[in-house]
Each structure stands twice: as C-alpha cells, then as structure tokens.
C-alpha cells in the first residue's frame, strides 16, 4: 500500500524526471506518486512541486511517461477539488495551456483526460477555463482540439448549465470550417444546444446563420432539426405536401404577413403573380410547421386579414396560383375546423362559382375544397342553401358535385339529425335529391341515386316519400342502383350511365363463332390422346428403329396457338368461360413389366420428372422426338435386363452419333452446388453433345452383372449453362444411385470402339461437384475381377408400379452426411494450416472491435458495420502470433450485453424499413457469438431470453425476423440452467397484462404484450419437452409455472390460451398427474377439460409411436 507523499519524495521525482535515466524508472516513480494521490491527502507543502513534476512528465516526448503523468495530473485535480480548491485555482490555471494542448492530441484517451480535467477545473475557475477553450482551442488550427472543445461545451451546458451565447459566433465559424469532421461536430453541437432553447434564441440563431453565410445544406439541416416534433393534425394527407416552415415569435409572424399584404394589393400582373404564389406557398408551409399550433389565434387573425388576397389567388387564371390557393384553403379548414366559420360564407360563394370553370383542374380543386370545408366547419343552414343553389346551377359540374357534398354532409350530421331538421335543412336536402333524381343529365341522376340511399339510411320515411313521387322508370333505376343494400344487380354487370347499351359498355352474352370453333378443335385434340394403359401392350406401337428416329418430326396440326392472355380475356358469358391453355396430360406410372416395354418406357418422360412448360401451349402440340425427352430419374435397366434376359436396345440421339444411357452421375453446372431439388424442365439440344468415356465389353459371354459399370460424362469447358436451358441440378438424374445396382451401359455404332486400357470396377459414391478440367478415367484390375462382390438383385412382382424417386430420401441423407464431413474436414484443415494473425492485423482488429463495441452500446452501428464486426469475430478464432486473445472475457461480456440492448431498443432514429435490417444483423451477430463461444454464453442466457421476448413484441408473426428470434430463444433455452430460466421467464411474463395483450391484438395501444407472452410460453414448453426426464420442476418452479399458465388460460387472446394449454400438457408429462392437478386446483373447469383433452391426445400419440417403434 502506498504512503503519504513527502517533500523529499517529490523533490527526488523532479530530479529524476530532469535526469537522463531510463523511461521505465521514471514511469515507475510517477505511478507511485499517482497511487499516493489517489489514496491519501496531498500535503500542502507538496502541492506546488507535485504540479511541477507532473507537468514535466506530461510534457515529455515518451508516450508511456505522458500517460502516467497526465493521468496523475487528472487525479490531482480531482483530489484538490475536495481538499484545497484555492490551491487548485492558482496552480490549475497554470496548467491550462498544457491541458488545451492535449485536447488536440492524436490519442483519444488523452483528449478524454483533457476534457475531464477541464470539467474538473471549471468548478473552481470557470472564467479562465472558458477563456482558454473559446480563445485558444476553438480558434486554433488543430481540428481535433476544435472537436473536443465542442464536445466539452455541450457537456458543460448539460451538466453545469454553462451559458453558450458567447460561443455562438465561434460556432458559426466552425460550421464553415475546412475540416468536414469539425463541421459535422459543430452542426450536431448547435442542434443539441438550441434544441430546448426559447423561441427568441432560435430566431437569433437563424439570423446568425444568415449573417455568417453558412452553407444552405447545413442551415436547412439545423433548422429542420430544431423544428417541433409534431405539426397540425390532418385527417387526410395533402396531395402535394410542402416543406414545413417554423416561426418562433409573434413578431416574426407579423413581419411575414406585413410583407405579403403588398403583393396582394391591386390586380394581378406579370410582376406580382409569382410573389403571390410564393406567399400562398409560404402560408402552406407555416401551417405544415408550427404556426397553427403555437400561434393559433395570431395566425388565424393574419389569415382573415389576408383573405381577400387569398381569394384573388384562388380565382386567378394561372392554374398553378389557383391550385396553390385551393390547397391553402383545404389546409386551413383541416387545421382550424370550426374556427374558420366566419370565412365560410364568402369561401362557399367563391368555390361553388369556381366549380363551373371550364378548366378541369380548377373545377376539381374547387370541388375538393368545398367538400373539405363542409366536412370540417360547423353546420348551418347557409351551407345547405349554397348546396341547393348548386343543384339549380345551369352548368352541369356544380350539379354533379352537389351530390358528393350532400353525402359528406349526411355522413357528418347523421348523429345530429335534430339540428338539421329544426333549421330547415331537411327540406332543402329533400329538394336537392328530388332535383337531382329528375335532372336532365344522366350522370347527375346516377350520382344522386347514391346520395338518396345514404339519405334513406338516416331518414327512411322521407326517402320512401321521395320514392313514391317518382315515375316507374326512375323508381326502377333507383331500386336497381348498386348502392341500394337490397339491389338485385351488381355494379359490374350494368351499363355505364349516359353511354347507352353498346357492346363496349355491356358484358358479352355469348361467345363468337370463331371462339366456338377453337373450343371444338381443342376438344377434338384431347380425344386423340390415348389413355395410359393399365397393363403392358395396350395402345403402344413397337419400338422405333434408329433410322426412324433420325427422321425429322412430322408437322404440327394447323392449329394456331393463342396466347394465354387472349384465351382468358376474350370470351364472355356462361358458355364462353375463360379456359386455361392445355397442358400435357399426366400419365400414370409405367408398370415394371417384363419384355422390351420397360426399355421403351425410357423414351417417354416420367411423370415426376416432366415439369410444367415454361410458356402456355395449346393441347394440340407438335409431337416431341425421343431425343428431347429427359432421362428417367431412377435406373430400371438393371432389373429389366436381368429378369427378361433380352438384349438391351440403345436409344441414339440422332443419326450417326452414339448414344448412351444417362449416367448415375450427372454433369453439374459449375455455378450450381449439388443439391437435391425437384427436377426442372426438359433439357435443350445443346446438352445432348456431351462426350462420355464409355467402357464397352468386348465379350458377350460375360454375365450381365459384370457388364454394369458407372461412367461419368465429361463436362464441356466452353459450355455456358443458363437457368433457362439447364436440364436439372446436379444430383437429380439418379437420386437413388448409391442404393440401387449400377445401370447397364451400351452404345450402338457402325464400328465397335476398342478399349486399350483395362477396365476397373468403379465404386458407387454420392455425387459431388467434379472439376471441369478433369474427366473420370475408368480402369479395371484383372487380378481383382474375380473378387468382385455380386450385387444382390431384388425381385418384385412383375406388374409392380415402381416409384421413380423411391430412394431419394436415402440420397438426401447421404448428401447431407458427406457435406457435414467436408465441412468438418475443411475446418480441421483451416485450423491446422491457417496462418496466424500478424501483430499489425491484430492491432487493427482490436481497434475495430473496440470501436464496434462502443457503437453497439451507443446503438449507432449500421448494417455494414455489423458485417465487419462479424468478420472480426470470425478472425478471433485464429490464434495471433503474440498469444493475446482478440475477444477477451470483458469485451465478450460488453459486446453481448450491448447486442441484447440493441435488439430490444426501438431505434426511433432509423426509418422503419431500415430498423428490421439492422435488427436482423444484430440477431446474426448474436448467433455467430453463440456458435463460436457457446460455453461463454451461459451467464447471458436469462438476459438474452428477456431481450428476445421484448423484441418479439414489436413484430407481427409474418415478419421474417420472428423465426430467427424463436430459433435463438430455443438455442438459449437449451444452453442455460432450466431452473433459472423458469423463474426468470415466469417473473417476466407474469408482469405482462393479459387483457392489455388482447387489447393490442384487437387494435389497441397496449403494444405487443400478447406476442411476447405467446413466445415466452412457447419457449418454456419447448424447454420442458427438450430436457425430458432430466429436468423435473421443484415445488417452487411448479407453482410459478402453474400460476403463469393459469393466468394465461383466462386470456382473451386465443394464441396465448393455446400456448398455455400446451405448456400445461408438457408440465403434466414432467411432474405427473397428482402434482400437476394439485398445482392447477385454482383453474376453472372449462380450461381443465381442455387440458385433459390434450393430455389424453398426447398420451395416445406417444403410445402409438411406441407401438410403431416396437413393430
């Protein structure tokens, strides 16, 4: 333990620092002094020499000595603040130049220590510290010192209440600094300093930004960030939104209106119309900002004073100006509602007159504006009178729009019928409807019918009286209107009003003659297709010879293939229903018979391998040649050859070229991995020219089973395979190759092929991607020829139906085992042969890892940063040359804790579409850490499960991240201690309100408590099932689980109730019948019956499974 400092010890330290001795000795002595300062009071006589000694150490050129001296100086400041502030004021100000210099140091640690020292010294000497920061650090040439001083200024304002007004001119200059990082820090500092500042301060900031000519991008970013977070509520989104503009004082608002008045005086001219449009747009921006909320009355007063000018803009012949004026009135109505009642009279007159304009845009905008005004302002009889006048207008457009205004009025006042009736509005509504139903224009009549049925829902007796007053034709049309709840007609079948009963407006009633003939031809072609025989010999002609196969195929029938869109869209009526293009008839499986029929079955595509065509085809199609048919997936040649004893007939692809049977090892594409998937479409001609190394048996006396050899096609190096013409993925041609006997290989040519190399038996293996530069060489050792094991052939019934992919499952399992073995071998080779990290790479990774952990804790790491962090985590498995681990325990704990905090945080600063991508990367990083360091994850299991449940509350079940959350929760539940998990999850889930969860699912504001609750119950059930008999809950754990399940059984949400029932079933399997029902004795009878049903169901399933395994 260190001792109290003495004068001799400090004097010796000063002498040692000035002497020419080793750095380690100096660092050791400074460290001793630092320990004494941290643990003991500094004697008054030693304060000045200690300051001198530490100043010497901090001014050294050696980093180790500077680190020791500057940290000791910081501890000395902290000690003297409590021990002797007067001495710190005197001696600390002398150290200010050194501290300000360290603000610009290259190492971030020294910059942080300098900022901390300034914060400590500010408590005793604020004036001197501010002067040094403002006049030295902020105006110097060191960019790091400027950044650090800005951070310090913000920190002092938030913690000590530092007044920053004197710093504003300096910060304006830093906003235009040559260094980009300084500009960014200055912008963020200004935003944070003025975020909660009063309105006059923000107005002064805007003036300062203008005076210092700050670049517009920075200025707009600052002003936008300082805007209020909420704007005036709007029931409907504006068709063309504007950038919000904000004012901070009433005086500023008055200056804006005073400037606008001059633009709206007199008539519209070429000189003032653009200023008028800009003024109207400015008013819209103010409404979008804070004028209507923060300065409600003042802004409305200004608008009323400017109303004449706004109306001049509305009735302008310039479309853009008129459109802006209409949009302004709509936004005023939405923002103020009944507060604009005094302006309604003149506005209704103006806009109803404008609806009769010949310009479609102006008329439509006026209609929308009137509708918005009616829906927002207080109802009075004058509004209804304006609508009645519009119904009598000589122009058709106001009469057409009036029906929509009536519907808006009825929807708004349906719950206040008395007010409408007592003011005479009901009579006017009746007059409007009668006038519209008898209007000369059919469009007006049709629109008014919809209004009538809405009126009938509010005043049915009045509507019945109107109906009785109509003539028979008008009454029938009204009854058949689609808006009639009891209408026998639907809107799709009727003619459009005013257009007559033409063919273009009515659905076709019967198909045309041409379509009928086409349907008849399609029916005839389907009759010519023979049915699949139930036995051999039926409907099949003898096998074709080689010469017949080389002939070109016969011409297709003269039937024009129509595109699918024409078939679907050109017919109408009942008999001419849309027809899907004809598809090849699915044929039943060929029975495994004796004779050449099994050989001939290879000429036809199998039912399972033939995929749907890539484009629509009619049923009358060109007959396909045998050469273009895909090969049967499962080899059947071996059995048929052995059983029948007949020679095998080859199937050449074209005349003059030898053709062999499909090898069990297919030629894969270089870019496609060998996976087992459904077969694709038929191969194209370009894949029929593969060259094969074919062993030909020279002796015909050999047994058939010794003729069976596997061959491998050589991959064409110059072939470019595209997805459209690739026959199938590797490994699909013979999925049962490892489990079935090899296939007989034969070739037909005019001259026999001589084999100079002796043949060798080929071992059957799981298909793997071969190299494109190598081909399979087939040899046979004559010495081991007699020792070959004869494959045992399995005989079945002669007419047995054989599945094409009967051994696909065996192949899938073999492929999976081989891939796992390859991965293990690669990992072992990588561990054995991997190069160790160099010291430079290790330092870089350590720096990046520390930065990544810091950004994760601050929740500011983006998607690319997470991917880089994942790469560093993968590199952490590589052993460095220095022996120092990259991911230490402290860093691992900090990273895992930060990741889980990141996962459950809402990330409100990101856009919703980016939040889920970032969360997915957080999840991937956690999974990678769990995979790499599974043993170290044990202390974080409970915390991780809580974070996963909280994160689950945000996402719907269809979101892709939900499956990742559930899988990670299952892994953590299997890793952690079961007792701890039960207690932690039960305590967390019990705090969730079941009713709130159901309310949220029904559209309430309770959040996603129901989702978290459901997932938590699911995790507990899965853990109980996975642990099995190894985990039996104790009495306390059983009581907690039973209490949780009992509360969830009463939930209003079905998913929570179901998960609670399944948890009870799993709990019953662990604790037995007596303990289980004793724990659930407080549950109601209905849930108990449901639990009993599922318990019995599970017992039957377990019993049936046990019997099946025994059998």
Swiss-Prot record:
Comp. bias intervals (Basic and acidic residues): 704-714
One GO process term, biological-process aspect: mitotic spindle assembly
GO cellular component: cytoplasmic microtubule; microtubule organizing center; mitotic spindle midzone; nucleus; spindle microtubule
Keyword field contains Cell division: yes
Coiled coil: none
Ranges where the record places region Disordered: 225-245, 476-751
Matches recorded under Pfam families: CLASP_N
Localization: Cytoplasm, Cytoskeleton; Nucleus; Cytoplasm, Cytoskeleton, Spindle
Ranges: HEAT repeats: 95-133, 167-205
UniProt KW keywords: Cell cycle, Cell division, Cytoplasm, Cytoskeleton, Microtubule, Mitosis, Nucleus, Repeat
Sequence ranges of Polar residues compositional bias: 502-511
Keyword Cytoplasm listed: yes
Any GO MF annotation of the entry: microtubule binding
Subunit structure and binding partners: Interacts with microtubules.
Purpose of the protein: Microtubule binding protein that promotes the stabilization of dynamic microtubules. Required for mitotic spindle formation.
UniProt record similarity statement: Belongs to the CLASP family.
Protein name: Protein STU1
Protein's organism: Chaetomium globosum (strain ATCC 6205 / CBS 148.51 / DSM 1962 / NBRC 6347 / NRRL 1970)
Lineage: Eukaryota, Fungi, Dikarya, Ascomycota, Pezizomycotina
Name of the gene: STU1
């Amino acid at each position: 333990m260190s001792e109290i400092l003495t004068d001799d010890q400090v004097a010796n330290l000063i002498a040692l620092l000035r002497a020419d001795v080793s750095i380690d000795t100096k660092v050791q002595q400074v460290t001793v002094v630092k320990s004494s300062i941290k643990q003991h009071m500094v004697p008054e006589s030693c304060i000045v020499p200690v300051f001198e000694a530490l100043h010497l150490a901090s001014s050294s050129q050696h980093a180790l000595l500077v680190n020791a001296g500057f940290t000791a100086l910081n501890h000395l400041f902290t000690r003297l603040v409590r021990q002797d502030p007067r001495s710190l004021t005197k001696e600390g100000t002398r150290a200010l130049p050194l501290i300000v210099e360290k603000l610009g140091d290259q190492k971030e640690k020294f910059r942080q220590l300098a900022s901390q020292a300034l914060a400590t010294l500010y408590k005793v000497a604020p004036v001197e510290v501010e002067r040094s920061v403002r006049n030295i650090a902020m105006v110097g040439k060191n960019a790091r010192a400027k950044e650090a001083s800005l951070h310090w200024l913000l920190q002092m304002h938030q913690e000590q209440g530092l007044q920053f007004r004197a710093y504003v001119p300096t910060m304006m200059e830093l906003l235009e600094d040559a260094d980009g990082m300084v500009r960014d820090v200055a912008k963020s500092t200004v935003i944070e300093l003025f975020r909660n500042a009063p309105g006059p301060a923000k107005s002064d900031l805007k003036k300062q930004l203008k005076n210092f000519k700050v670049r517009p991008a920075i200025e707009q970013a600052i002003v936008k960030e300082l805007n209020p977070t909420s704007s005036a509520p709007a029931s409907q989104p504006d068709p063309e939104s504007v950038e919000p503009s904000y004012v901070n004082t009433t005086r500023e608002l008055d200056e804006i209106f005073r400037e606008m008045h001059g633009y709206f005086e007199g008539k519209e001219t070429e000189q003032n119309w653009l200023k008028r449009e800009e003024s109207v747009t400015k008013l819209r921006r103010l409404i979008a900002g804070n004028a209507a909320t923060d300065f409600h009355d003042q802004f409305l007063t200004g608008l009323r004073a400017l109303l004449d000018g706004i109306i001049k803009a509305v009735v302008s012949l310039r479309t853009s100006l008129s459109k802006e004026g209409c949009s302004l009135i709509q936004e005023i109505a939405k923002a103020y509602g009944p507060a604009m009642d005094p302006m309604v009279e003149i506005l209704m007159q103006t806009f109803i007159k404008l609806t009769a304009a010949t310009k479609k845009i102006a008329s439509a905008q006026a209609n929308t504006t009137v509708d918005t005004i009616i829906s927002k302002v207080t109802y009075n009889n004058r509004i209804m009178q304006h609508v009645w006048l519009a119904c009598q207008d000589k122009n058709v457009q106001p009469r057409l729009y009036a029906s929509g205004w009536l519907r808006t009025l009825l929807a708004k006042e349906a719950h206040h019928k008395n007010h409408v009736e007592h003011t005479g509005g009901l009579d006017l509504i009746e007059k409007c409807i009668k006038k519209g139903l008898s209007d000369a224009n059919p469009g007006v009549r049709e629109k008014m019918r919809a209004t009538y049925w809405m009126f009938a829902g509010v005043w049915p007796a009045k509507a019945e009286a109107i109906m009785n007053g109509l003539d028979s034709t008008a009454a029938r049309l009204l009854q058949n209107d689609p808006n009639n709840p009891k209408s026998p007609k639907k809107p799709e079948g009727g003619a459009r009003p005013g257009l007559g009963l033409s063919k273009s407006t009515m659905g076709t009633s019967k198909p045309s003659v041409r379509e009928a003939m086409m349907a008849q031809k399609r029916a005839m072609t389907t009759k010519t297709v023979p049915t699949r025989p139930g036995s051999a010999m039926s409907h099949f002609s003898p096998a074709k010879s080689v010469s017949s196969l080389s002939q070109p195929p016969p011409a297709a029938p003269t039937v024009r293939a129509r595109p699918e869109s024409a078939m679907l869209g050109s017919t109408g009526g009942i008999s001419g229903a849309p027809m899907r293009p004809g598809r090849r008839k699915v044929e039943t499986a060929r029975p495994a018979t004796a004779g050449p029929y099994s050989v001939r079955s290879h000429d036809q595509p199998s039912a399972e391998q033939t995929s749907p065509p890539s484009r629509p085809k009619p049923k009358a199609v060109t007959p396909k040649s045998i050469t273009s048919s895909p090969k049967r997936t499962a080899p059947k040649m071996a059995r048929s050859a052995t059983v029948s004893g007949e020679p095998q007939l080859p199937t050449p692809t074209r005349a003059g070229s030898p053709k062999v049977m499909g090898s069990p090892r297919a030629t894969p594409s270089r870019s496609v991995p060998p996976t087992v998937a459904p077969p694709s479409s038929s191969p194209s001609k370009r894949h029929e020219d593969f060259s094969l190394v074919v062993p030909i048996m020279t002796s015909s006396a050999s047994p058939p089973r010794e003729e069976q050899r596997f061959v491998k096609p050589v991959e064409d190096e110059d072939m470019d395979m595209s997805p459209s013409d690739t026959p199938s993925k590797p490994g699909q041609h013979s999925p049962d190759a490892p489990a079935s006997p090899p296939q007989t290989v034969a070739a037909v040519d005019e001259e026999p092929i001589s084999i100079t190399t002796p043949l060798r038996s080929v071992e059957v293996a799981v298909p793997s991607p071969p190299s494109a530069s190598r081909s399979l060489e087939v040899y046979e050792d004559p010495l081991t020829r007699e020792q070959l094991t004869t494959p045992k052939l399995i005989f079945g019934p002669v007419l047995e139906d054989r599945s094409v992919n009967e051994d696909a499952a065996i192949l899938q399992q073999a492929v999976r085992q081989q891939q796992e073995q390859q991965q293990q071998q690669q990992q072992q080779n990588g561990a054995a042969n991997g190069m160790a990290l160099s010291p430079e790479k290790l330092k870089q990774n350590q720096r990046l890892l520390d930065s990544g952990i810091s950004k994760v804790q601050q929740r500011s790491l983006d998607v690319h940063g997470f991917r880089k962090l994942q790469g560093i985590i993968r590199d952490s498995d590589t052993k460095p040359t220095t022996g120092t681990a990259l991911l230490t325990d402290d860093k691992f704990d900090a990273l895992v804790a930060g990741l889980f905090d990141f996962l459950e945080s809402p990330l409100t600063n990101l856009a919703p579409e980016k939040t889920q991508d970032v969360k997915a990367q957080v999840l991937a990083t956690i999974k990678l850490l769990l995979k790499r360091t599974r043993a170290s994850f044990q202390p974080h299991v409970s915390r991780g499960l809580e974070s996963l449940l909280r994160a689950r509350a945000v996402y719907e079940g269809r979101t892709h991240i939900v499956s990742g959350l559930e899988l990670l929760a299952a892994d953590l539940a299997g890793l952690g201690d079961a007792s701890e998990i039960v207690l932690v999850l039960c305590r967390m889930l019990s705090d969730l309100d079941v009713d709130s969860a159901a309310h949220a699912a029904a559209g309430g504001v309770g959040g996603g408590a129901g989702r978290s609750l459901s997932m938590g119950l699911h995790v507990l059930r899965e853990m109980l099932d996975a642990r099995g008999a190894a985990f039996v809950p104790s009495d306390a754990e059983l009581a907690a689980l039973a209490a949780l399940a009992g509360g969830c059984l009463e939930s209003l949400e079905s998913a929570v109730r179901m998960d609670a029932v399944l948890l009870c079933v799993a709990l019953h399997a662990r604790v037995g019948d007596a303990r289980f029902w004793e724990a659930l004795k407080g549950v109601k009878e209905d849930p108990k019956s449901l639990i009993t049903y599922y318990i019995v169901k599970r017992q039957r399933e377990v019993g049936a499974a046990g019997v099946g395994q025994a059998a």
